[in-house]
Amino acid sequence: MSKDLNSSRIKIIKPNDSYIKVDRKKDLTKYELENGKVISTKDRPIASVPAITGKIPSDEEVFDSKTGLPNHSFLREHFFHEGRLSKEQAIKILNMSTVALSKEPNLLKLKAPITICGDIHGQYYDLLKLFEVGGDPAEIDYLFLGDYVDRGAFSFECLIYLYSLKLNNLGRFWMLRGNHECKHLTSYFTFKNEMLHKYDMEVYDACCRSFNVLPLAALMNGQYFCVHGGISPELKSVEDVNKINRFREIPSRGLMCDLLWADPVENYDDARDGSEFDQSEDEFVPNSLRGCSFAFTFKASCKFLKANGLLSIIRAHEAQDAGYRMYKNNKVTGFPSLITMFSAPNYLDTYHNKAAVLKYEENVMNIRQFHMSPHPYWLPDFMDVFTWSLPFVGEKVTSMLVSILNICSEQELDPESEPKAAEETVKARANATKETGTPSDEKASSAILEDETRRKALRNKILAIAKVSRMFSVLREESEKVEYLKTMNAGVLPRGALARGTEGLNETLSTFEKARKEDLINEKLPPSLSEVEQEKIKYYEKILKGAEKKPQL
């Protein structure tokens, strides 16, 4: 065996070989880059990037010892360094916020001066910039119009920091509900995934409970109707808002849905003015863009403002290139009938838009714009670098191994041709041996069979590695489906799901979905013991009644 190894092309590297000895004098604390710059291996290569906080803070740090309220100053810095809270601390802040918010009416009535902000969407580092531009919340009143979570990677940090400011500034800091503050949308977009990555389902449920108690609208200075989405055909008076049962999930239709989902029509500014309104013109049309609620017209806005003695509607809900948009002026008041605010700069890291806040003070309205702030990068779906890169690396490594091992021709690797060719060759050698009786011919025949066996083993290895390569490729390209299958199958990928590539994965997913739907009845909450007893009583009563109705023999 050793002789075969030495005669092969494989070089056995021994530990005492001179060319693999480590230079003991080399300073391993220093590393020279390609450009000649020497850096320390003990320090962070890019010192300008803040280090991540890995420590879970104590309760004394998170909560004020005197008031018991969240320490928003500490949380601000802790979240800035990507720190996390314990599960108990997070739930405590969420429960405190739920209690405080539930005591507020559906329609808030606020006074100026106040700063009004639009969508935040999980952009925590831009939220900190917002407070730099808008002013210290301890000194200035704030009204947020909703959509604190989803899309951005720091939704939880935004929510908890805003809640901590709310709890410390009751009567001065106000938060409305947006259409993303619900289980339906947060499950579809990113917030639920973020919560399961950073915490767990219990913390996510606590967040959703807090969403259900957020107020729906605000009347600012008795002149401005502030809401996340817009107005509704069911909204005749601002007081109609107080008639809504808001302590629930957002419905798919009705006044509550419209307040959070409605948009102005695309040609809002092209409408006629005042008495020139076209009587046949619709005030509300189906909102095809959103798939629910309505799109309201300039005519609808003017009618609502006139009926309630208001100047303007201030809302959020739509990204704006400048961070805000002033719509067509109301001819009666000479003031914009509608204002849209958006406070998430460079939305989704792709829009390149500015953000803005509206500062209203002494009957003067100022709009302050700001640009995005640098923020830590997260991979899609909160993947870690190993989960993200391993399938790619594995695919390339196996591809390289296939290339190295693929030293046989296609004919040699053909499973049908190999045994036949080997058999024919051996038979020919055997016949020749019988005729000549030469021992060397017998050895040659044995060598041919051995070569064919090796070739077959090599072919099987190549096919096995190619199969692994294919599985890595599927893992990389279909990572979302793979993760979903694992989630729905107790964290384990069903056997054979990757073997047949993307097609097989899709079939597995389809089959699994069908089975899951059929089994949904078992996902319901089981009946209580009292309910079981009631069902038994009803069953026995039904049997007795049936027995009484039978004729006596």
Swiss-Prot record:
Q: Which family does it belong to?
A: Belongs to the PPP phosphatase family. PP-2B subfamily.
| Enzyme Commission number | 3.1.3.16
Annotated Zn(2+) binding lies at: D147, N179, H228, H317
* GO molecular-function terms, A-Z: calmodulin binding; calmodulin-dependent protein phosphatase activity; metal ion binding
Chain coiled-coil ranges: none
Q: Which cofactor does it need?
A: Fe(3+); Zn(2+)
Protein name (database record): Serine/threonine-protein phosphatase 2B catalytic subunit A1
**Quaternary structure annotation from Swiss-Prot or TrEMBL:** Composed of two components (A and B), the A component is the catalytic subunit and the B component confers calcium sensitivity.
